């Protein structure tokens, strides 16, 4: 009987009738999370967290373990799919004013930080050339912290350089953090259901709600099928599309790659980091590139929640999307003109969105309500 009540609660959950496909990305993220946890568990069974054996153990998984190549490729492609979904999920939140549900937005931003940390630790685990050098560059940023920077870095490394203790603790963190993500996701969903979802119009949905099942469950199943089909097509035809050639060589501390870069989903933050020719300034900008999302609920000035009827803000939003893509592209290029200038200009544009948004909201209020 209690199970039936739980099922009824899920089935009869009232949801606004006009929410679009952009609201399906939450369930897609939940599926990605489940997929990553399952594939990650099976990979962890065969992985060895040792600097001499890590690279060989990954090769062993793909070559010798039954269906190991599926697990390894699904885990790698799943990470990229996770970030594609989360960036679209955040973009939808910015466009439709979902950030005004403060608790949900703030818990979601904390989730993003933990997710990025988890993905970074996971990128180091294969102990390839790019894994090692990306870890060296990014962890070295801690030395920019005044007074305690060097101590913090040595504490994280477990010594005076990246070595076996570093890999062991990164593996431990990469294993434990997904469970933190699952716990926080539960809180995120619980907080969402106390107030309910917004909708494309930004109005109150109470006047027109429909049951979650069958309407939205069928919508969810459709997008999940598309996502999983895409993942399997990539896995079978071009499994290494998101990988860098340098990472197919074992880590060598004596040979520095020509161009050090993290995975594609961190390139926007990496582009902002390297556009500032100062270590501390770059590190602060790197953290702010994500932390600035925390400010949006407190800087909203428009009388309208959604951007649906706000053409000026829409223009600024699509500029932000173009800026995000341009920073990502520029960060893949060497640190030389014109890429440094492009990186600096796009970084400036990226942060200007969060300054212009409240100003444009105020201006649109003036224009819209002049004659009322």
Swiss-Prot record:
The keyword Transcription regulation does not apply. The chain crosses the membrane at residues 25-45, 69-90, 105-125, 170-190, 218-238, 280-300, 312-332, 339-358. Heme b b562 binds at residues 75, 174. Pfam families: Cytochrom_B_C, Cytochrome_B. It is found in: Mitochondrion inner membrane. One of its GO terms (cellular component) is mitochondrial inner membrane. Keywords: Electron transport, Heme, Iron, Membrane, Metal-binding, Mitochondrion, Mitochondrion inner membrane, Respiratory chain, Transmembrane, Transmembrane helix, Transport, Ubiquinone. It comes from the Eukaryota. Heme b b566 binds at residues 89, 188. One of its GO terms (biological process) is mitochondrial electron transport, ubiquinol to cytochrome c. Its cofactor is heme b. The keyword Transmembrane applies. Binds 2 heme b groups non-covalently. GO terms for molecular function: metal ion binding; ubiquinol-cytochrome-c reductase activity. It is a multi-pass membrane protein. A ubiquinone binds at residue 193. Heme 1 (or BL or b562) is low-potential and absorbs at about 562 nm, and heme 2 (or BH or b566) is high-potential and absorbs at about 566 nm. Component of the ubiquinol-cytochrome c reductase complex (complex III or cytochrome b-c1 complex) that is part of the mitochondrial respiratory chain. The b-c1 complex mediates electron transfer from ubiquinol to cytochrome c. Contributes to the generation of a proton gradient across the mitochondrial membrane that is then used for ATP synthesis. Belongs to the cytochrome b family. The cytochrome bc1 complex contains 3 respiratory subunits (MT-CYB, CYC1 and UQCRFS1), 2 core proteins (UQCRC1 and UQCRC2) and probably 6 low-molecular weight proteins. This is Cytochrome b.
